[in-house]
Structures are given as C-alpha cells and as structure tokens.
Amino acid sequence: MPMKMGWRWYGEGNDPVSLSDIKQIPGVTSIVWALHDKMPGEIWEVDEIQKVADQIHAYGFDMDVVESVNVHDDIKIGLPTRDKYIENYKQCIRNLSKFGVKVICYNFMPVFDWTRTDLFHPVGDGSTALFYEKDKIKDDYKAMAEYIMSFTEKYNMTFPGWEPARMAKLDELFKPYAPVTKEKLWENLKYFLEALMPTCHECGIKMAIHQDDPPWDIFGLPRLLVDAQSIDRFLSMVDDPYNCLTLCTGSLNANPNNNCAEIVRKHCDRIAFGHIRNIHHFPNGDFSEAAHRDCCGETGIIEVLRAYHDCGFEGYIRPDHGRQLWEEGPGNCRPGYGKYDRALGVQYMLGVWDLLDRLDEEKKKG
C-alpha cells in the first residue's frame, strides 16, 4: 500500500477550509482530525466521535489519523492522579478504534505546545508565515500567552495547546513543573507509554509522538524530542511497534543541525505519520516557515521524500504549516493552516513522489 496523503482539518465552524474545499485537492484521501473542544484528560465519547465521522465520511475521506488526543499535565508531571487520566486515555483509544482510527498523534511538551513570536510575519513576497524571533523568547511566558490570546479574543479562533482555559491559569500550570527535571519527564513519558501499549495492541492503534517545537528548552521547561539522539532513546525506551513517531520536519529542522532524511532512513518502520514542513533559517538563529518547494527553505524536502520512498513508506503524510497567501490573514485563516499554500504543497509532494515512482519503474525495465 502506498503512502497516504492527509490534510489537517479543525472541524465544522472551527476551520475556514471546508471538507468541500479539501475534496477538490487531488491526492488527499485522509482527514487528520480531532475533537478540538475536548480538554486534556477528558474521554472522547462515541457519540461525539460519530458526529465528526459522519461529516468526514460524507466526502469519501478516511479518518485514520487523529491529531491530537492531548496528554493531561498530571501525567507529564507524574502526580498520583495520573493513573486516572491514563485510564481515560485508554478509553479514548478504545472508542476511536470503533471508527477505524489507526494513528494517534500527540506530544509530551510541558505547558505549551508549539511556540512562535509572530503568527502572520511578512516574508517579502506579499505572503505571511509563522516566524520565530529568538531574542523575543525570554522568560516572560505571560507576554507570549497574551500575544497568542489576542488572536483568540479578536478573531474567535483557538489554537491547539493554547486553549484559553489553560492560558487563564498559567501560574498554576508552571508551579507543579518546577521539580520536574528532564530525566523525570523521560520517566513519566515511559510510564505513560508502557501503560498504554497493551490497549494499543488490543485496538490496533499506534501512538505517534510529535517532536518538540521548537526543539530546545523554553521558559525553563525541559524538552525531550529534539534531535536524532533523543529519538533513538525514545524508541528504544519502549521498544514496541505501536510506540511510533509523528516525524515533523519543521519542528526538527528549526535546529539546522538535524538531518531529517537520515532520521527517516534509520527509523522508517517506526514512523506512523509524517509532517512535511519547510524552514528558512536566519544567521542569528531566527527562522521562518516557508513554502514546501525544496529551494524555499533548508529542510531538504526532496531528500526527505526520497528517504520515505526508498524505505517503501506506507504510512500517512500531510502538508504541515504553509504560508498565508492572497486574501488569507487574521480573521479568515488559521496561522500556518491556510488553504492555498498547503494545497500547493500537496501537489509538490505528490509530484516528487510520482517522479520517484517513475524512476523506479524505469530502473526495473533496465
């Protein structure tokens, strides 16, 4: 079975890009979805899943990949209450398996999910993109949260990992993490996964961890999945075929020393889901997200796709963050999740894949 192309969709009334729009993009067969109104630790009930399933299936898409079932902070911190939330997570897995879900993407980042300093940064050609300015990331996490929340308040748009209910109690979230060292966070991640693996086997669902974004410590909080060595540790720590990766080229390549193609070749059999995102680096350590075409950034998109192709990858891939093009901007577009640049990215990736298929066919013919 060949690689399957997905598209992240935030749901009816929550995403300016409709399923009807997505249906018109050649090659997209899978909707990457979630119940975005659920808080970490809550059970995803069958009737809630059914409602979204009906919407997705009406357009002929599969719903094999969920992004994300977020992990409760008590699990990450290692509090005594974590077992209750792990049991809830297991029930989510069981309920999702009733709808044919094959992969759950998640992350284990403390407090914050992704972090950027500008959501609509001009990139010089009239488009805008997500931008990270290193000098703006100091120790003032409240200022960063206020910036993100300003978009929520002005445009009624929420962002995964930056939910208003969580941001309203930032100090409460930070305090329990004070004694959590990097090693303790590793221990808590292992505990979580070892508890889940029997349920994953029972239900046929792979847990696929997303790398930390950006891949370095911020606001004094430890980050785990940041480079090839930490990925090696993660996969060997719970050496189980259902303990997998969501390999995000954009998160990893925010550090230009990370070679994503090499990681794909080494761990292709443990990659369940791939995010393809291009990054343009600046000499001072800042970075901007870029178009998917190889020459628009320094991620090495062609080599990453070649690595997946050479490995016979049969999992799921989606275009990750693109630019905001033409009329897209605050109020009518989710940062990084516009319609046009991601659609262009899909066609670019499938074009590279088709060429690699053709070259293989010609080799076989001699």
Where are the language model's segments positioned?
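Glycine-rich, proline-tolerant flexible connector loops at the mouths of alpha/beta enzymes
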Residues: 34-50, 219
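Conserved beta-strand edge residues that scaffold enzyme active sites
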Residues: 36-37, 70, 110-111, 214, ...
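An N-terminal, globular interaction/scaffold subdomain
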Residues: 45-68, 85
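Catalytic domains of carbohydrate-active enzymes, especially glycoside hydrolases
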Residues: 11-36, 55-59, 95-104
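Extended, charge-rich helix/loop segments that form flexible
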Residues: 111-188
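Acidic/aromatic-lined carbohydrate-recognition and catalytic surfaces
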Residues: 65-99, 103-123, 127, 134-145
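Histidine-acidic metal/acid-base catalytic patches
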Residues: 1-6, 11-13, 54-57, 74-78, ...
